[in-house]
Amino acid sequence: TSMSYGEILSSFLIDLQSVFRKKIKIKNASFQQIMALSTIPSKGIEMTPLAKKIGIDNSTATRLIKRLEDSGWVNRVASPHDKRVIEVRLTNAGSNMQIEIEKQCDKIGEMIEKSVNRIDRQTVHDSIQSLHWVLIKMDLDNH
């Protein structure tokens, strides 16, 4: 019998996290810090949307961002629109870290692509992209 969507997605999440944890190595950065760094757009992001994007509560995000700030990878600044709102922005060192993370992610992508039968590569790529769009739509529908 084939696996249900839930079983496949659960296994996929675990396996994908395992690959990323093993293959992405950034000195002195935890996996959660790497995920946060890779999520912060170049223009910055407010704390609440960042917490939602990486799937943690605001208090956990605050501690995580404090550690990133202590490492010199981000700055926390008051939003110009509302001084009560905190924005997280990458420093130059944080931008460099983000570039390094992207390079390491690209290497993982290349390894996976090479592991897929040449004939099936486009189909696999399109299926992953389709799944990604479904997840984005689900996330947007929940706001």
Which sequence ranges carry the predicted segments?
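N-terminal leader segment of winged-helix/HTH proteins
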Residues: T1-K27
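Residues in the recognition helix of alpha-helical DNA-binding motifs
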Residues: F12, L64, S127
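Short helix-coil-helix linker/hinge
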Residues: K27-Q32, T91, V116-R121
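A cross-family signal for key residues in well-ordered alpha-helices
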Residues: M35-S38, I99, H125-D126
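Terminal interaction helix/tail motif
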Residues: K103-H143
